[in-house]
């Protein structure tokens, strides 16, 4: 699936999988042609067609991989400007992996299992990307930080523990992953397939 979002400051890119989970294949923030998102723009804002922000794929992958729905404001890519004066857009290509998603609140164990084949972890995050998940009886200040990510270390440690096994328990705890955001109540979000 290919999605293009013009960067006007309030625009949000919305990715969704009806079944399975998001896997970002390609992502570009910038401009590579003179026709995309040109509506109402002067010609001088469309001239640079070799403009791309480095790190776009990594940022989107961190935010969206393993989720069923993902919203990203184009503002997150404005940390630096790859081509000043050029009107940019976010172009994303993603696929939906037929994965099982397991969510476990901090302090519990995530039981991953395959009836057939063995576990292959595609993405895992220990932290918080949402205010509603694992929020029961928790004070608001423990739920406020929704940009608490530790995806690369969580994915590698979970994969180390579970890949190629038919079942595996992973603790949602600081002892395994460290504490990516002190004071925030976290959860472990794992997307895996059986193969």
Swiss-Prot record:
Keywords: Hemagglutinin, Lectin, Repeat. Residues 1-97, 104-195 form the SUEL-type lectin domain. GO terms for molecular function: galactose binding; melibiose binding; protein homodimerization activity; rhamnose binding. CDD domains: Gal_Rha_Lectin_CSL1-2_RBL_SML_rpt1 (cd22833), Gal_Rha_Lectin_CSL3_rpt1_rpt2-like (cd22832). One of its GO terms (cellular component) is cortical granule. The keyword Cytoplasm does not apply. Loses half of its hemagglutinating activity after heating at 50 degrees Celsius for 120 minutes. Activity is abolished by heating at 80 degrees Celsius for 60 minutes. It holds the Pfam family SUEL_Lectin. PANTHER family: PROTEIN EVA-1. L-rhamnose binding lectin. Has hemagglutinating activity towards rabbit erythrocytes and human type B erythrocytes. Hemagglutinating activity is inhibited by smooth-type lipopolysaccharide (LPS) from S.flexneri 1A and E.coli K12, but not by rough-type LPS from S.flexneri, E.coli K12 and E.coli EH100. Agglutinates E.coli K12 and B.subtilis. This is L-rhamnose-binding lectin CSL2. The lineage of its organism: Eukaryota, Metazoa, Chordata, Craniata, Vertebrata.
């Amino acid at each position: 699936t290919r999605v293009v979002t013009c960067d006007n400051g309030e625009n949000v890119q919305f990715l969704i999988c009806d079944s399975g989970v998001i896997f970002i294949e390609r992502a570009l923030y910038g401009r590579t042609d003179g026709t995309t998102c040109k509506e109402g723009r002067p010609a001088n804002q469309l001239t640079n067609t070799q403009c791309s922000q480095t790190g776009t794929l990594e940022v989107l992958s961190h935010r969206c991989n393993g989720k069923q729905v993902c919203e990203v404001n184009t503002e997150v890519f404005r940390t630096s400007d790859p081509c000043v004066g050029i009107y940019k857009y976010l172009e994303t290509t993603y696929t939906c992996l037929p994965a099982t998603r397991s969510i476990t609140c901090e302090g519990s164990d995530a039981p991953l299992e395959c009836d057939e084949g063995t576990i292959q972890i595609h993405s895992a995050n220990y932290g918080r990307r949402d205010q509603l998940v694992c929020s029961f009886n928790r004070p608001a200040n423990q739920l406020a930080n929704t940009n608490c990510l530790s995806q690369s270390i969580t994915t590698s440690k979970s994969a180390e523990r579970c890949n190629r096994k038919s079942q595996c328990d992973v603790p949602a705890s600081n002892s395994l992953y460290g504490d990516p955001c002190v004071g925030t109540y976290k959860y472990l979000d794992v997307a895996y397939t059986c193969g």
